[in-house]
Curated annotation (Swiss-Prot):
The gene is matK. This is Maturase K. InterPro entries: Domain_X, Maturase_MatK, Maturase_MatK_N. It comes from the Eukaryota. It comes from Castilleja linariifolia (Wyoming Indian paintbrush). The lineage of its organism: Eukaryota, Viridiplantae, Streptophyta, Embryophyta, Tracheophyta. GO terms for biological process: mRNA processing; RNA splicing; tRNA processing. Keywords: mRNA processing, Plastid, RNA-binding, tRNA processing. GO terms for cellular component: chloroplast. PANTHER family: MATURASE K. Belongs to the intron maturase 2 family. MatK subfamily.
Amino acid sequence: MEEIQRYLQLERSQQHDFLYPLIFQEYIYTFAHDRGFGRSILSENPGYDNKYSLLIVKRLITRMYQQNHLIISPNDSNQNQFLGRNKNLYSQIISEGFAFIVEIPFSLRLISCLEGKNKKIIKSQNLRSILSIFPFLEDNFSHLNLVLDILIPHPVHGEILVQTLRYWVKDASSLHLLRFFLNKNWNSLITPKKASSSFLKRNQRLFLFLYNSHVCEYESVFVFLRNQSSHLRSTPFGVFLERIYFYGKIERLVNVFVKVKDFQANLWLVKEPCIHYIRYQRKAILASKGTSLFMNKWKCYLITFWQWHFSLWFYPRRIYINQLSNHSFEFLGYQSSLRMNPSVVRSQILENSFLINNAIKKVDTFIPIIPLIVSLAKAKFCNVXGHPISKPVRADLSDSNIIDRFGCICRNFSHYHSGSSKKKSLYRIKYILRLSCARTLARKHKTTVRTFLKRLGSELLEEFLLSEEDVLFLTFPKASSSLQGVYRNRIWYLDIISINDLADHKSKL
């Protein structure tokens, strides 16, 4: 345990003061708003961009300068008039600004880390891409046997998130402001029935940052244990850090297994218990080449360690151990499974020829069409059966504006899901968006889709719904013939840093 504490102390060696004065600077809110301005038609709070203005920010900063408004009385909720009648808008503005501020220490830490290793800042756009995980899965998961499917729970109390951030930020005023937000809205964050409304939708970036910082705290310990496991591969979880017994256990294992015929088949558990861990938000996956007993030991150890040292309460039904051969797991809007790719090799020796059937394991990644149809139905692009419908829009939006919004959604979706091995599902989603756009325009002009397309022509829709193939041809015109075969295969773009809105059909944090 002392080694773990020293490890964490090194990670927390950089702390930053005086972040609280930045809350009173107008440019902070401008940066925060510009960074999150690219909201699509699927935005949970479309009115926020229309109501945002520098005048409102100045008025909010003036109210924050009056310290008596920050006094919170637990007995009389009406006494605190800090947010006033515009509490939802003010709350979101403060939340986005505060989220931008508290990310500064982590950004500085990343820059200093890169400078320390290479004496210069490295362009790490590809390393930030969340889709870079799928080439990793294709390269490493094909030879694994078991997968541990984990749904990480919320912390039991908001103060845990504040204490986690306190390791990095020593500014007490900023931490008090964070307590102000969490204490008033904690129930709406952890209650499933309330998690889809109110505070969470308006302040999602802030809470995701706090949650990820807390998860990274115990994931750093997990990385430490994984590094130490290279010396302790056969040690049970109860004495996982006691190196003194390691070699003795190895000798006893050899004495036991040497009497078994399949000694080499069993000894690999001691030599190479390959483990891979990936996570996005609350979804985590731990894959291994070991046996069910080996994975159960990891499960018991991690649950016990996280509950005792990080106050995370895991329910047994949140963690599943499945065989990769007959189980598909969902991650980042994709569904991945391990399938056998048959191949036939013809071998000829003199006058005799033989056909040798080989089966190669391959990770197959595709789009789960049914959850996406449900997500499109909730966003009013289609009904539950997948039939496109017109989407209600504001009357002051022009036709080109509506087309641009639908086109942006379609192109982003194609860009995000270009790695799918089943293109049929991708084409179906494009068809729904294309026809929904046509019906939306026809509804605006109070006519039918057929009449609208005859009057304006189908080119109106085709010019903004460029397929990935067209984009590749426009980017590489000289290699258009060779790119035809490339487009039929999967393409992973390494410039995507957030999950697609439509792909995130699961309940968010």
